[in-house]
Amino acid sequence: MSVIGIVAEYNPFHSGHEFLMNQARLAAKNDPIIVVMSGNYVQRGQMAIMDKWQRAKAALASGADLVFELPFSFAVQPADIFANGSIKMLSDLGVSELFFGVEDANLNFSYLGQKINQIPKNRMDFRDYTQTYATQYNEMVAREVGHEVNQPNMMLAVAYAVASEQLKNPLHLHPITRVGSGHDDPLLQDKIVSSATAIRNYCLHHPNDLSELKKYLPKGELVSLESQKVYPNWNLLFSFLKYRIESASLEELQSIYQMSEGLEYKMKEEIHTAEDFTSFLRQIKSKRYTYARLRRLCLYTLLNVTENEIKDSYQDVSTLLLGYSSRGRNYLKKIRKDVQVPIISKVDKKNAASGTLGLQVKVDRLFEQIIGEDQNFGRKPIEVK
């Protein structure tokens, strides 16, 4: 049996994701497809536009057999930690094949992963404080392996390859060339596949009429988007962030995960004059940090996620089962006794008291307040026949 894995955010699920799923299904035939998906917060430091249950439902409708939540501790992180957490989780769940979308599928990603893992860890490549870590990393990779990886999906793909090659049994990698718009294209394009960024932007600017999105979404997804009472975004959250920064002491801010190099002082200083979240980011931006890094820091601050909480969560890693098909249920029965990561089907006070699930429940409290629906307690995995 070949078990196929996909790492995803599905923010939201669109035609490009459906294309990748179809390619995976052609390869899998009757074998299971497992998706590890970010929860209600995504890698670049934002709330997802739809909750994790609706996005899992879309994946199942498109052909996934099992959808698991990637814990917050891994999901809202730079590419290397995001990849390490998701790839190890897929491996622990028995996945042997990884499908992912990239701008250039002709590269030998396994080879790139091997080469990058051979680079000494004590190098001085990342000491230039006039450039972001991401820029320095990409320059180092290009210098060492001869390929630039500065496009979003390429960077993640290389991170997947590096993480895979660190496993005892590396995954077989299957890069699939992306179709349609670029990853970060902000506007809808006259193509069948538009970027998730463009779709989110359209939802925020035209919440009362989403009919234009129909051609970019799989069947049924437009109805799901239209049923949303609110589309979570940083504009909604900025007043909460402002209160949090203004009311917290410097000592409290210093305990926040990834708060470093005096950023707490800069945030305290600039929050008073910032008109909105975008202007606040510009005011605290420096050459040292990417906007994604600062958005993540703002999210950690808003949710009061501390350095110790992240460290403690890594001592007790589990994953929440969001949904399954009949094929997925049968596969779970076969592996459940031997699986390397605890699988949670029902959240209760005991399993939510600590670890990655405990932190997930904590951070989801705000998301619940925004959308008005419970996200953990009282929920059960979605079943599709």
UniProtKB/Swiss-Prot annotation:
The EC number on file is 6.3.4.-
Q: Which Gene Ontology terms describe the biological processes this protein takes part in?
A: tRNA modification
List keywords of the entry alphabetically: ATP-binding, Cytoplasm, Ligase, Nucleotide-binding, RNA-binding, tRNA processing, tRNA-binding
Which of this chain's residues are annotated to bind ATP?
7-20, 101, 153, 178
Q: Which GO terms describe its molecular function?
A: ATP binding; ligase activity, forming carbon-nitrogen bonds; tRNA binding
* EC category: ligase
Where is the major localization of this protein? cytoplasm
Q: Which reaction does it catalyse?
A: cytidine(34) in elongator tRNA(Met) + acetate + ATP = N(4)-acetylcytidine(34) in elongator tRNA(Met) + AMP + diphosphate
- Asked if tRNA-binding is a keyword of the record, the answer is yes
NCBIfam families, per this entry?
A: PRK13670.1
Q: What does this protein do?
A: Catalyzes the formation of N(4)-acetylcytidine (ac(4)C) at the wobble position of elongator tRNA(Met), using acetate and ATP as substrates. First activates an acetate ion to form acetyladenylate (Ac-AMP) and then transfers the acetyl group to tRNA to form ac(4)C34.
Assigned protein family: Belongs to the TmcAL family.
Q: Record's HAMAP family?
A: TmcAL (MF_01539)
Its protein name is tRNA(Met) cytidine acetate ligase
Q: Which organism is it from?
A: Lactobacillus johnsonii (strain CNCM I-12250 / La1 / NCC 533)
What is this protein's gene name?
Answer: tmcAL
